[in-house]
Amino acid sequence: MTWRSCIAVVEKPTAKNMKQKKGKPLFTSLRQFSWSGEKGRTGTEAMIEATVLEWYEQKRRKPSPEELALINSIKPKCCPHCGGTFAKDGFRESGIRSFECCECGKKFTALTGTIFDSKKIPISEWIEFLLHLFEFHSLKTSESDNRNAETTGRYWLSKVFAVLRGIQDGVVLSGRVWIDEKLFDAPKSEKESAKRKSNAKGGLTRGCQYYVACGTDGERSFYVVTGKSKPGDKAMLKAYGKRIAECSTLVHDGEKGHNAVIDALALKSEVHTSAETRGMKDEDNPLDEINDLHDKMEKFMRAHSGYDRASLQDWMNLFWLLTNGPRDKMDKVKWFLEMAFSKKIRIKYRDRFGKIEK
C-alpha cells in the first residue's frame, strides 16, 4: 500500500462522544466479551474468545532476544533521576539490564525517562505503528490493524510528537528555493466563533484558516505554522528568515510579504504569479516543487481530518519526517527509534487519558 491509497477519516474525540457515565468504563477492554462470566459458552463464543486472547498475548509477548540486546547495548550518560553517576545492578526479570545511582540510590534502566519507560508492549510493535503513519494510515485504521485499544493510537502519537519537537531546528535551504503558504480551514466551532466576533465588530470574518509557511530546495524542506491570520512582513521573516541561506534564488508567487524576506537575505527573486501558472501541466509549472509538497500535505492531513488544530505544528513535524531524511521507510523507523532512545521524554498514560471531563 502507498500513501495515495491509504486515505481515511478518524473521528475527533469531543466532549460529546468522550462523555463518561458514572461508574461505567469509558472504553471496553480487548479481553472483555458480552458473554464474560456466563456459564456454558457456545462453541462460537469459545472460538472467538480464544482467538482474540491469542492476538492479545501476541501483542504483549516478552521482548525478543534482539530487542533485549538492543536495549542492553544502550549506555545511559547519567542517572535520569538526579544526573549522578551510576553502577550496573544486574538484570530485571524481563532480561533488561538495571543500574543503580551512586548518589540518589534509585534504580533505572536504559529506557527510564524515555517514551518507552514502563512499557507494556514490546518496542518492536512500534515498527508497525510507525510504518502505518508513514503510509498515511489514519489512527483509526492503525488501531484496528494493530488490534490496539481506542486510546493507544493517540497515546503513542503524543509520544511521536514529543520526540519530533524541534526536529526542524537548524534546517537551512540554499541555492534555488521554492516557498509558498499552505492554508488549512479552522474547525466549524472556531469558524462560528470568528463569525460572531466579526459580526459584533461589523468587520470581515478573520481567523478561519491556519497558515503554514513551506519551503523546499528540491532536497530538503520545512513546514512552520505561522498562525490563524495571513502572515505579514514580520511573520514572514520569522518563518523564513532563519531557514533560507543568504543570496539564494527565491522562486515564489509574488506574495507581497515575501519582499521582506528577499530584502533581509539579499535573495534573487523569481516570480511566477497564479495568473501565469493557472492551467499549466505539473511538468511545465515552475512552482511544481512546492505545489507537489502542498498536494502531499493535503492528502496526509485529510487522512487525519479530526486532528486538533492546536497540534498542527506537531503534525507538520511528522510530515517533515515523511518528506525528509532517509528515503526508505525502514530507515525512517530506525532514525525515529534512535532519536527516541536518546531523548529523555516521559509521557504518562494517566496524564493523557486518566481524567475525562464530565
PLM regions and their residue ranges:
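Residue-level recognition of single "structural anchor" positions
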Residues: 2-358
